[in-house]
Swiss-Prot record:
Compartments it resides in: Cytoplasm
PANTHER family noted in UniProt: DIMETHYLADENOSINE TRANSFERASE, DIMETHYLADENOSINE TRANSFERASE-RELATED
UniProt organism field: Haemophilus influenzae (strain PittEE)
PROSITE patterns found in the cross-reference section: RRNA_A_DIMETH, SAM_RNA_A_N6_MT
MF (Gene Ontology): 16S rRNA (adenine(1518)-N(6)/adenine(1519)-N(6))-dimethyltransferase activity; RNA binding
Catalytic EC class: transferase
Pfam family, one: RrnaAD
Binding site for S-adenosyl-L-methionine: N18, L20, G45, E66, D91, N118
Protein name, UniProt field: Ribosomal RNA small subunit methyltransferase A
Catalytic activity: adenosine(1518)/adenosine(1519) in 16S rRNA + 4 S-adenosyl-L-methionine = N(6)-dimethyladenosine(1518)/N(6)-dimethyladenosine(1519) in 16S rRNA + 4 S-adenosyl-L-homocysteine + 4 H(+)
Top-rank taxon, per record: Bacteria
InterPro entries: KsgA/Erm, rRNA_Ade_diMease-like_C, rRNA_Ade_Mease_Trfase_CS, rRNA_Ade_methylase_Trfase_N, rRNA_adenine_dimethylase, SAM-dependent_MTases_sf
Principal location listed in the UniProt entry: cytoplasm
Amino acid sequence: MNSKKHLGHTARKRFGQNFLHDTSVIQGIVAAIYPQPNQFLVEIGPGLGALTEPVGELVDHLTVVELDRDLAERLRHHPFLHQKLTVIETDAMQFDFGALYTKENLAEKGQKLRVFGNLPYNISTPLMFHLFKYHDVIQDMHFMLQKEVVKRLCAAPNSKAYGRLTIMAQYFCQVMPVLEVPPSAFKPAPKVDSAVVRLIPHKELPHPVKDLYWLNRVCSQAFNQRRKTLRNALSTLFSPENLTALGIDLNARAENLAIADYARLANWLADNPPADINKDEILDSEE
């Protein structure tokens, strides 16, 4: 028996496909999303419809973004939801959610996008970074993720889970864990535990920065060398005198600073950019 085959479809490794089938977990996720008939919901990676069907039954219309050609075609011909579904066959990492918001005239309707999905674990972090760009047109997001990723999203300073992903997520959103999900809830079963997280974009950013590049830069540099003191880890960006003037303990490490501290450092760099920094380079990170 092919353990990767579910409802006639074989999971494709390159798309990171693991299909949810546990009814109680599905009910818990739908309850957390709490979809209402007139809301504009967007599902990323609907797969075989484990969440699409129960959510679709509760709303007037549902937009789904699916990269897998075969699955997209199945959804277009869904036996009882096809008239409610708009299937966008594309890579969510490349999709312009802002253009969708504009096309659907949601501003005139006083609405924003509600985004949810069982995200492919191999792209979940970069996909969330992509979605954060559209924080001002998104009402909330509910995602199934690797449990360790949810821990990082929800982490507090002075913990091992606290990192660049924590800071960037909490910069844009209020983050709350919803429920934990065992591997047995999927087919094929992943090798890791999963969890559902709720992200609600801030109506007003609590710690706005002048240029997101510098927030990304200082977080990447600090957490890539998280065992070093900030005096050493950030030495190419700040002098010890600069850090002290900004209220940073020279002996602190990356996980000791709050988001407000990183925002303060980023804003100083925006006003005092090092001459030898190329802003077009790709930032590496431990996340």
